[in-house]
């Protein structure tokens, strides 16, 4: 589903890679496959229980839409729990309640500040993508 790359840094995954919760387990215990991404140890450890930057959320949301078939096949082959609607709702709710300027994890040793304008733009872009996909 992620082309054998770390979701966060796009480097090839090592033989021993980790699974990260996009929305950290400490914020919302959600093990649905849609909340999980492959990560190398360095990125996963650095992100820890931080919320990811809006750019990561945008890429995650796009992959849920464009790789729907890959995700369904993975769920079927592994029997993993899938709940895309709930996971998307958790993401929307989590970011909707953030204070302007909240630090978001962008990369190892780099945070970005939450900007409501960027979040609103992402939500509108996603709504447009969903309308186009439904046509």
What are these regions (language model features)?
Residues 7-38, 47-62:
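Histidine-centered nuclease catalytic patch
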Residues 41:
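Gly/Ser/Thr-rich active-site loops/lids in small-molecule metabolic enzymes
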Residues 3-5, 44, 132-135:
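Long C-terminal interaction/binding lobes of large macromolecular proteins
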Residues 2, 19-20, 87:
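Short amphipathic alpha-helical surface micro-motifs
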Residues 51-135:
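Extended charged
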Residues 44-47, 75:
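Short leucine-rich amphipathic alpha-helical surface patches
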């Amino acid at each position: 589903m992620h082309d054998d790359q770390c979701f966060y840094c796009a480097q090839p995954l090592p033989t021993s890679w980790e699974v990260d919760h996009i929305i950290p387990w400490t914020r919302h215990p959600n093990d649905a496959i849609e909340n999980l991404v492959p990560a190398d140890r360095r990125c996963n450890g650095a992100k820890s229980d931080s919320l990811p930057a809006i750019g990561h959320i945008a890429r995650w949301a796009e992959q849920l839409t464009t790789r729907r078939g890959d995700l369904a096949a993975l769920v079927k082959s592994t029997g993993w729990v899938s709940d895309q609607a709930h996971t998307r709702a958790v993401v929307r709710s989590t970011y909707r309640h953030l204070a302007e300027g909240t630090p978001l994890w962008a990369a190892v040793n780099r945070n970005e500040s939450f900007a409501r304008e960027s979040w609103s733009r992402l939500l509108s872009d996603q709504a447009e993508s969903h309308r186009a996909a439904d046509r």
